[in-house]
UniProtKB/Swiss-Prot annotation:
The lineage of its organism: Bacteria, Pseudomonadati, Campylobacterota, Epsilonproteobacteria, Campylobacterales. NADPH binds at residues 7-10, 31, 33, 111, 113, 184. 1-deoxy-D-xylulose 5-phosphate binds at residues 112, 132-133, 155, 178, 191, 196-197, 200. It comes from the Bacteria. This is 1-deoxy-D-xylulose 5-phosphate reductoisomerase. Its EC number is 1.1.1.267. It holds the Pfam family DXP_reductoisom. It comes from Campylobacter jejuni subsp. jejuni serotype O:23/36 (strain 81-176). Belongs to the DXR family.
Amino acid sequence: MILFGSTGSIGVNALKLAALKNIRISALACGDNIALLNEQIARFKPKFVAIKDSKNKHLVKHNRVFIGQEGLEQILTECQDKLLLNAIVGFAGLKSTLKAKELGKNIALANKESLVVAGSFLKGAKFLPVDSEHAALKFLLEGKKNIAKLYITASGGAFYKYKIKDLNQVSLKDALKHPNWNMGAKITIDSATMANKLFEIIEAYHLYDFKEIDALIEPRSLVHAMCEFKNGASTAYFSKADMKLAISDAIFEKQDTPILEAIDFSKIPALKFHPISTKKYPIFKLKNTFLKEPNLGVIINAANEVGVYNFLENKSGFLDITKCIFKALDHFGVPKISSIEEVFEYDFKTREYLRS
């Protein structure tokens, strides 16, 4: 297996699972966490290693260290392994997804942004979903026909119990306290704004070629997806909130190993589902427009990344993330995109506009 994003929460969990099944790790790539990368190199002995910045190359305890996006593409070309787990965060993961598709590799995709910004250019790719909701949908949809609607669930994020009027006072520390999941900083903020769920709906559309998709808040994160059929029946996928299950579904050939403790249905409290309030989560107003106009993805994602990283660096407030997205959409409208090069151009233009 090739693992990009090895020091993030998905990567760390994937390596625990790889050790469980003695999966060979041929390549590791990370951003700046060189100390953890060196531990992973010592444990898994990959042939190839990549890091984000050449200034850290001398710190890496390996004799084949590649640098940046070009380095990732070189590894994909040179490494014969058929499986890439792409757990790079954000738009930075797109080039690796495109290259892996070109090379015919199986792509265990944790980098949902690849599909959000360039789904129409990734048709025919061999995807294995790593998001818990999409792994759940895959299970529910297998061999099924006559589907009326799909649902994925959201926890509501760090501010689910907050009043709307209190959201302009929240701190970064507050925003990083996810009630159910242990995740990286960016996706935790995306969960708090509901950008993550908006992106997951578009990801589901591209993965399963189905537009009747919605999301509901299920605060306990025990139900991950539901499938409604034309005859009125529905099915649901239950599991405890732990990413290892979805990762194992993607990287294991057989699903015969106990990964999580099963839910004891006699002990869980009553489950409740709630519609997502667009007053509290205004980003979710974009759902129907986004499904009609998937080209909006590159604008929404770039603006979201600018807004989130400004917030993470204490340059702006929590509510400014959403304002950033609507400002970019007002300026650019629906982009006409006919080539993958234009996706990169619009990403660049959006970031430049918001930083000017």
